[in-house]
Amino acid sequence: MPGFYEIVIKVPSDLDGHLPGISDSFVNWVAEKEWELPPDSDMDLNLIEQAPLTVAEKLQRDFLTEWRRVSKAPEALFFVQFEKGESYFHMHVLVETTGVKSMVLGRFLSQIREKLIQRIYRGIEPTLPNWFAVTKTRNGAGGGNKVVDECYIPNYLLPKTQPELQWAWTNMEQYLSACLNLTERKRLVAQHLTHVSQTQEQNKENQNPNSDAPVIRSKTSARYMELVGWLVDKGITSEKQWIQEDQASYISFNAASNSRSQIKAALDNAGKIMSLTKTAPDYLVGQQPVEDISSNRIYKILELNGYDPQYAASVFLGWATKKFGKRNTIWLFGPATTGKTNIAEAIAHTVPFYGCVNWTNENFPFNDCVDKMVIWWEEGKMTAKVVESAKAILGGSKVRVDQKCKSSAQIDPTPVIVTSNTNMCAVIDGNSTTFEHQQPLQDRMFKFELTRRLDHDFGKVTKQEVKDFFRWAKDHVVEVEHEFYVKKGGAKKRPAPSDADISEPKRVRESVAQPSTSDAEASINYADRLARGHSL
């Protein structure tokens, strides 16, 4: 949700008193302008003060022009409302915080203020007290620049009616029709209040009704709880992921010092909640049904290697949900560039927490695998030193493992995905290779053999493709056989040729030259040779 700075600009209504010495041309410009309401407005034009509105319209237009220049954000969101107060006409100018940090806001606003004096008031500063001011977190000295969220608009600005409400401008799509339409304003306010009520009810439902634990109830705590809940839903555990998911949201929390301090705490709390209450399927399975899965890269890789994508998808889904008992591991086997790492990497990066097996360090190979949602074993080998722990982890059993510079820690049942082009069921012990653990290891795995090389422009599997594939698997589940080799299927057999397609067999050309004489001639020649031999 974007954050906004609020600048309150007072608008002169008594030109002689508020702008002493202003030129006649300025007075004529203000007096000559006539305003009309758009056709979809239900406001009363007679309740609108047109002369101050002319000045206000020029002020907001020039202010936004300068704001876009200093913020370097031409698409920055804004909402401006012109109101008639008890003492003065004034504008509430809400501008998105994007591009302007709080520490330099005062400097930029001073520049904009001088521009408005020169361009609009011909160098004459209004005598209105504090006519150009940014809203602070508290009155008096020491308050920081206040950042409000979008809820400020339906909470405070939209409920205003005539004659207090004079005019409004915005580039926010959801409020365009409500600027000058009182009925639409009421509808949006009611919709917002309903949403707030539902959110509060949902927060109450999420709390343990049998718990008597004290809960701080305030706007600050509600906003913090909303932030942590959003981070958990999106699986965000770092500031980098937050920026990639919603840059405006991240910047809005950096705009003020009080909200900036919540960032690391919220990420830390969200991570703890995810590790304790969420599992891999919560992030691997997408929310929306998939209509066409044929363009999905995981689907293409499996189909290219002769697997039935629906059956293979059911294997992946059951693996993620730990449905197959001790057969807790998927082994993607094959040479380079066949997509095995492409699939495993995408699955691992889709969940908030994944661990990698460091098989090169035999002392602490599973150091990174504690409290993870998925374990990824990339291009490794099975050694006699780690095979017993590996069998427990691959089989989804609880096992304690040594950790570097720490005491041993327990690895809970966690889905494992292995990518390798070597035999992971052969145990290497020094210079020898043994197969005594082959059957137990095979009983813990589903093996996919990927042998078809991918084109150079095939591309990387994305997180969304992973979620779509698992969602499609959930909607098309089939029965899976508990076998080491995942059966292939879906390949089309070439039909037998018909009689019309069968041609006469070609004559085979002999490669050895045949003698030119017949058998009879050969016998006569042998007789002549025998007779000549006797005569000698």
From Swiss-Prot:
Q: What is its EC number?
A: 3.6.4.12
Cross-referenced Gene3D superfamilies, in alphabetical order? 1.10.10.950, 3.40.1310.20, P-loop containing nucleotide triphosphate hydrolases
PROSITE patterns named in the record: PV_NS1_NUC (PS52022), SF3_HELICASE_1 (PS51206)
Q: Which InterPro entries match?
A: Helicase_SF3_DNA-vir, NS1-Nuc, P-loop_NTPase, Parvovirus_NS1_helicase, PV_NS1-NUC
BP-aspect Gene Ontology terms: DNA replication; symbiont entry into host cell via permeabilization of host membrane; symbiont-mediated arrest of host cell cycle during G2/M transition; symbiont-mediated perturbation of host cell cycle G1/S transition checkpoint; viral DNA genome replication
Q: What keywords sit in the KW lines? A: ATP-binding, Covalent protein-DNA linkage, DNA replication, DNA-binding, Endonuclease, G1/S host cell cycle checkpoint dysregulation by virus, Host G2/M cell cycle arrest by virus, Host nucleus, Host-virus interaction, Hydrolase, Metal-binding, Modulation of host cell cycle by virus, Nuclease, Nucleotide-binding, Viral penetration into host cytoplasm, Viral penetration via permeabilization of host membrane, Virus entry into host cell
- Give the positions the UniProt entry annotates as the active site: Y156
Residues annotated to bind a divalent metal cation: E83, H90, H92
Region span, Disordered: 196-216, 488-536
Task: State the span of motif (RCR-3).
Answer: 156-160
Composition bias of kind Polar residues appears in 196-211
Class of this enzyme: hydrolase
| Keyword tRNA-binding annotated | no
Q: Where is the SF3 helicase domain?
A: 308-463
Ligand binding (ATP): G334, P335, A336, T337, T338, G339, K340, T341
Q: Which residues form a coiled coil?
A: none
Catalytic activities: ATP + H2O = ADP + phosphate + H(+)
Q: Domain named PV NS1-Nuc: which ranges?
A: 1-199
Q: Name one Pfam family in it.
A: Parvo_NS1
Q: Which GO terms describe its cellular component?
A: host cell nucleus
Name the cofactor(s) required for activity, per the record: a divalent metal cation
Share what the entry says about its subunit structure, partners included.
Answer: Interacts with host TOPORS. Interacts with host KCTD5.
Purpose of the protein:
Plays an essential role in the initiation of viral DNA synthesis. Binds specifically to an inverted terminal repeat element (ITR) on the 3' and 5' ends of the viral DNA, where it cleaves a site specifically to generate a priming site for initiation of the synthesis of a complementary strand. Also plays a role as transcriptional regulator, DNA helicase and as key factor in site-specific integration of the viral genome. Inhibits the host cell cycle G1/S and G2/M transitions. These arrests may provide essential cellular factors for viral DNA replication.
> What is this protein's record name?
Protein Rep68
Q: Which gene underlies this protein?
A: Rep68
